[in-house]
Amino acid sequence: MDYHMDYIPNEVISHQGERFVDKYVDRKILKNKKSLLVIISLSVLSVVGFILFYFTPNFRKSDLFKNSSVENNNDDYIINSLLKSPNGKKFIVSKIDEALSFYDNKMKDINKNNNNNTSSDFKGLSLFKENKPSNNFIHNENYFINVFDHKFLMNNVEHINQFYTFIKTNNKQYNSPNEMKERFQVFLQNAHKVKMHNNNKKSLYKKELNRFADLTYHEFKSKYLTLRSSKPLKNSKYLLDQINYDAVIKKYKGNENFDHAAYDWRLHSGVTPVKDQKNCGSCWAFSSIGSVESQYAIRKNKLITLSEQELVDCSFKNYGCNGGLINNAFEDMIELGGICTDDDYPYVSDAPNLCNIDRCTEKYGIKNYLSVPDNKLKEALRFLGPISISIAVSDDFPFYKEGIFDGECGDELNHAVMLVGFGMKEIVNPLTKKGEKHYYYIIKNSWGQQWGERGFINIETDESGLMRKCGLGTDAFIPLIE
């Protein structure tokens, strides 16, 4: 089976500042206010839609829709085009002004009818989890987004729209307006970093905002970078050392030479699809399970999907969602007598789960595992298969989009991934205008196929593979099933 992918770049989200205002909301008139706001919002959108529809035949003459096509003239395209156009923003503001004037008049009538002498004009909207009726709006709560302030709207409407799209796309839920505000600020900070990086023409890779965009690096690190420091197991019955490596590589390599420039196991049916560890610090399990899956694909011609959840639950040398070691995973995998398939023992992320080794009758095991010398990574990769490795990740890593990663590294080994290939790409130097060869390792990650290049990342190296950026391969193991 061929796992080679075409990688499609996405738009990078831009950045501006954000302003929040405080407003007290009276519960007694909330329901009426909310209904009116819905009616007003629908009215404004209807007016916008009607005007755009009415002038659609002449849209080619308008700068707003320049270089567009009829097929692209859908709701999302129209809204995004309006948001990018100063005249479009002014039009929206004028319609909101009209709606707000109508709303204020209605609110005066409502206040009079309810004999409410303490009500205030409603000036803000909030985005947060509506798990309880009382959470729709909260007395004395701060930080409502002021969408009726002209300067705020003109300066931030694009980013509010982007943040809303981010929330919707990633199914984010916030427990309060205050949390929403804090996440929005983090989102904007990350957006700024992404924009600044992508403006650097010297970098070999691009960034993008993704599901991690509302997390600080400290939060991201504590949740996803949970690899423990490797401690060689003394007197292990299963770990093959340097002496055994020479014997094993000779068995599969013989006297054959190989091209140090490029080899990709995805092109040789040796890599199973990228998975997602979700909200569990289980990178160690995905790295070790993935390399076992690759061995069955390469040696047995079996495409199987094994259970990371069984390792998370039953690898007692490791710490479940709180981290672990690759070599401990292989040790426990052997002690357990093999691993069930993912169908028999499905992944549930960070949900509590007790170990149940009897969920399946057929298990897939390994005989032992091999420690790969850090100066033999390309050789081992080419002749033995994908390798479970450690790496030192920094805050540049989470927002990787495409290209050859040449960013900053972490100061400690904190993540487990898979080494699945290596390659070379000739890139024109923007200063010399000459093509330069850039070598890289191909890494399979466990953050889903929406991250990076369909779940993979390319990290710079040299032709020999001895350059191990970010400590790549300091811990390197291959499971053996024969």
Swiss-Prot record:
Bilayer-crossing regions: 36-56
Localization per Swiss-Prot or TrEMBL: Vacuole; Membrane
Glycosylation-annotated residues: 67, 117
Chain ranges for the short sequence motif Bipartite vacuolar targeting signal 1 as given in the UniProt record: 16-25
Cited SMART domains: Inhibitor_I29 (SM00848), Pept_C1 (SM00645)
Entry EC no(s): 3.4.22.-
Entry keyword annotation includes Lipoprotein: no
Protein name stated in the entry: Falcipain-2b
Species, as recorded: Plasmodium falciparum (isolate 3D7)
